[in-house]
Amino acid sequence: MTIKVLSVASEAVPLVKTGGLADVAGALPSAVAPHGVGMTTILPGYPAVMKALARPRALHTWNSLLGEKARLVSGKIDGHPLLVLDAPAFFQRDGTPYVDSSGRDWADNWRRFAAFGRAAADVAGGAVKGRAFDLVHAHDWQAAMALAYLRFAPPPGGRRVPSVMTIHNMAFQGHYGADLFPALGLPPQAWAMDGVEYHGGVGYLKAGLEAASAITTVSPTYAREIRTPEFGMGLEGLVVSRGNRVSGIVNGIDTAQWNPETDPALAARFGVKSLARRVTNKRALEAEFALEADDGPLFVVITRLTWQKGIDVLLECIDHLVGIGGRLALLGSGDKAMENAFHAAATRHPGKVGVRIGYDEALSHRMQAGGDAILVPSRFEPCGLTQLYGLAYGCVPVVARTGGLADTVIDANLAAVMAGVATGVQFEGVNYPSVSDAISRAVTLYRQPDVWRAMQRAGMKTDFSWSRSGKAYADLYAALIAEDQ
């Protein structure tokens, strides 16, 4: 029997993406399908999403969804069922899903994503004829209210199905003032410590965590970390109270899109048995970033330029990296002061440091294929994808020991190197001594070609496809449904 799951997400590739959440939401339907799960994704009707619908068919209408007219339309996403909340007053606007064209949060985000949650709860609860689901899976705060509505205000005659709440990043919680509670259309009993109330206001993510049958994060280590004040962001007590209902499942990567043997973006394709071809990609990348061509290690960085990503410390380490024979190519954007500081570093070290501000998907592939090591000094990283891409492409990860980075990279300590299982370099603490020492370790390992090549091969042989992760989610769904019967 096929398990029918409604996946509630505010973004999903290939239709709309601002971060890693979109990669997961887009990959999940195909990942769980071989394990007896039929997944339907529901998305807000942003302009790009509506444009991608060939012939949208209306399935349901709301005359007043938090005060606005809306309809539910159907389509496909990579061959899987797609539902879209077509609510122009909420979603047909310029900018990104969450911010306007000037980069400021939409002032009515509370209302937009409450409406999305209300609609998703109606769909999951059986209000739409011909659409029945066994379980609902919500992603991050933008989808969390779906679980609160199912718990406190299911559709008339609807049923409360089991649910999963996935935390992709605890730093984003959707916390709003108490004055908006009456507009949410929830009963008075929802205003409670075990409901939507959070520090005197309304907490969207908190409400979803309280209502969920099970909570997942995107790595086992992050599932443990969010039980602590350092990573729990104020919700650690709630996470601890949920006990064994909290678990971590590492994200997979799309091995069709990220495969060095078939990648059309590369100057030279290669595999685990043809690593010598990587040098062609290295030479091409050096030329693309106006770097000197030499045999020293080329470090790459592909990231948002933010404090979370440890970029401030990386900036401190550039002189050290260059001083011991390394070079650096960076692709990213974010904090303007950090952007300017990287430009200054490139001016200070011509031919040694190259910088591209912005994001370019094809370039990110070329960097993974041409770089020798990828630096990921994040202060916290729920899962992380760039290190997984690095492993797949023989670009050895140098990572902070946190979250998914700790779960996916095997440190090149003596025992791991001797056993042939080391895949990268881990360091403890995001500060100058730790990061600079990790860079030095990477350079030392790079200068031992046999060891470095063994690390590359071990990483490339590691299975980080969605197959394993898909089975873990499918097993969780089945267990929750069995428990509910």
From Swiss-Prot:
GO terms for biological process: glycogen biosynthetic process. One of its GO terms (molecular function) is alpha-1,4-glucan glucosyltransferase (ADP-glucose donor) activity. It catalyses: [(1->4)-alpha-D-glucosyl](n) + ADP-alpha-D-glucose = [(1->4)-alpha-D-glucosyl](n+1) + ADP + H(+). The keyword Glycosyltransferase applies. Belongs to the glycosyltransferase 1 family. Bacterial/plant glycogen synthase subfamily. Pathway: Glycan biosynthesis; glycogen biosynthesis. Synthesizes alpha-1,4-glucan chains using ADP-glucose. One of its GO terms (cellular component) is cytosol. It comes from Novosphingobium aromaticivorans (strain ATCC 700278 / DSM 12444 / CCUG 56034 / CIP 105152 / NBRC 16084 / F199). Pfam families: Glyco_transf_5 (PF08323), Glycos_transf_1 (PF00534). This is Glycogen synthase. ADP-alpha-D-glucose binds at K17.
